[in-house]
């Protein structure tokens, strides 16, 4: 990993072989992943999503976190609370949930992992509530917006980076 320093922010330039192997059907999007000061009470390894900021923070300790840009739930589809990462999946298949099927009745019953129309992207961290995940995307232009049905979307190279850093059992806190 190479690190570039400016004032008090470090930018990561990481040549992830994993990410290159995982990204299905497309070029990498520019990521704004960076290490930033973080003043919340959270153990290292905790994931904090600040919905209003549209950022995910991975707490690394010493008053710092890695900040990733994300897409979050659109109005009426957001959730707040605490869950745990209960699974890690590479190039997961996607079964559209009922509320998504209701709005998009022509969706197939399952979209295979790695397919260009699979919204899960390169990897997914499933959450203990069973309904949501932190995952990649096939719509990188949605990052930084309120776009999902409640899941947390990341650039594929960012979710690959997070996948490598986070363990099953990690705490996930989603706040306004």
Model segments located where?
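Short linear, low-complexity motifs centered on an aromatic residue
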Residues: 1-3, 27
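Hydrophobic alpha-helical targeting segments used for export or membrane insertion
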Residues: 17-22, 95
């Amino acid at each position: 990993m190479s690190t570039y320093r400016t004032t008090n922010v470090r930018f990561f330039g990481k040549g992830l072989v994993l990410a290159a192997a995982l990204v299905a059907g497309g070029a990498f999007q520019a990521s704004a992943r960076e290490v930033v000061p973080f003043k919340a009470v959270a153990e290292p390894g905790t994931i904090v999503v600040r919905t209003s900021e549209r950022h995910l923070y991975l707490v690394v300790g010493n008053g710092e976190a890695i900040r990733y840009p994300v897409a979050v739930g659109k109005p009426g589809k957001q959730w707040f609370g605490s869950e745990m990462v209960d699974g890690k999946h590479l190039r997961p298949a996607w079964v559209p949930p009922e509320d998504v099927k209701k709005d998009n009745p022509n969706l197939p019953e399952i979209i295979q992992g790695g397919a260009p129309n699979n919204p899960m992207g390169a990897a997914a961290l499933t959450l203990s509530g069973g309904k949501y995940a932190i995952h990649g995307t096939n719509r990188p232009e949605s990052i930084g917006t309120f776009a999902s049905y409640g899941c947390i979307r990341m650039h594929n190279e960012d979710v690959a980076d997070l996948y490598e850093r986070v363990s099953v059992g990690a705490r996930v806190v989603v706040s306004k």
